């Protein structure tokens, strides 16, 4: 037996899987790897599909971690939440790199299969919408996009009505004794969050006395990390779109780059940014 064959067939490596689960079976690779179905015969459409499917898988993990972190904070278990939120940031950094790969798609290549997309657009990504909802950017009007699928629409409806990460972070301030205005605590959580002076004052006190409020300070910084990464993702999205289609209208009907530039101004945790100026 050749030396390289000896390495591959090292003693103890399992080779008989007639009655045992394989790696491919555990990951359901047959199903996963058969889901890349091009609607054109253009070579580069495969790149487009794989990039977006991979991003959706990462977003599934982001939601898994965000929901667990929200429940953990509700139960006053901040330390486990820190680990989950730190993982979200790492996932975000990974997704951002995918834009570098998609940017290898030139305008001439994309135009060859763009019409195959019809009105399908990343704007319709329900997982991205759920991430926005989980972070507190609620857009009730967007639910109409998902009416085609009643089960999916119900999931989005549930996500819209659930407390966001920032909602439970503000509740953590209340539990620590900070006086948060009742309008914030009793607000309609299906609507976008609007910044509040009492919330800002609370975070300002947290940042002014880090030792006393260490856990709240750590929570605040984890939130800033997530929003920072999300804004970087949005910027790379906008520049990649501009690089590939310029200022054409998006397939989903948006104004394309102009819309993506406006989105950059959306904030999830406004008071946490404001305190940096006031410290």
Swiss-Prot record:
GO terms for molecular function: heme binding; metal ion binding; tryptophan 2,3-dioxygenase activity. Its EC number is 1.13.11.11. Heme binds at residue 237. Substrate binds at residues 48-52, 110, 114, 251. GO terms for biological process: L-tryptophan catabolic process to acetyl-CoA; L-tryptophan catabolic process to kynurenine. Pathway: Amino-acid degradation; L-tryptophan degradation via kynurenine pathway; L-kynurenine from L-tryptophan: step 1/2. InterPro entries: Trp/Indoleamine_2_3_dOase-like, Trp_2-3-dOase_bac, Trp_2_3_dOase. It is an enzyme of class 1 (oxidoreductase). It catalyses: L-tryptophan + O2 = N-formyl-L-kynurenine. Binds 1 heme group per subunit. Keywords: Dioxygenase, Heme, Iron, Metal-binding, Oxidoreductase, Tryptophan catabolism. Its cofactor is heme. Belongs to the tryptophan 2,3-dioxygenase family. Homotetramer. Heme-dependent dioxygenase that catalyzes the oxidative cleavage of the L-tryptophan (L-Trp) pyrrole ring and converts L-tryptophan to N-formyl-L-kynurenine. Catalyzes the oxidative cleavage of the indole moiety. This is Tryptophan 2,3-dioxygenase.
């Amino acid at each position: 037996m050749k030396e390289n064959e000896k390495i591959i067939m090292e003693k103890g490596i399992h080779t008989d899987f007639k009655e045992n689960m394989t790696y491919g079976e555990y990951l359901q690779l047959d199903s996963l790897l058969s889901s890349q179905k091009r609607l054109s015969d253009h070579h580069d459409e495969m790149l487009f599909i794989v990039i977006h499917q991979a991003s959706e898988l990462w977003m599934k993990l982001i939601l898994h971690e965000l929901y667990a972190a929200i429940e953990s904070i509700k139960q006053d278990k901040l330390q486990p939440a820190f680990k989950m939120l730190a993982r979200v940031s790492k996932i975000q950094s990974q997704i951002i790199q995918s834009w570098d790969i998609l940017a290898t798609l030139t305008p001439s290549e994309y135009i060859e299969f763009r019409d195959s997309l019809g009105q399908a657009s990343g704007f319709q990504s329900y997982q991205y919408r759920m991430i926005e909802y989980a972070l507190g950017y609620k857009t009730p009007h967007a639910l109409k996009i998902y009416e085609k699928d009643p089960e999916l629409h119900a999931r989005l409806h549930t996500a819209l009505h659930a407390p966001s990460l920032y909602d439970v972070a503000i509740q953590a301030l209340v539990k620590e004794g900070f006086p948060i205005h009742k309008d914030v605590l009793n607000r309609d959580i299906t609507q976008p969050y609007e910044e509040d002076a009492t919330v800002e004052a609370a975070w300002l006190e947290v940042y002014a006395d880090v030792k006393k409020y260490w856990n709240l300070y750590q929570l605040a910084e984890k939130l800033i990390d997530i929003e920072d990464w999300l804004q970087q993702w949005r910027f790379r999205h906008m520049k990649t779109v501009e690089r590939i289609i310029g200022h054409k209208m998006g397939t989903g009907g948006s104004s394309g780059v102009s819309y993506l530039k406006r989105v950059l101004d959306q904030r999830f945790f406004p008071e946490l940014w404001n305190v940096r100026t006031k410290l």
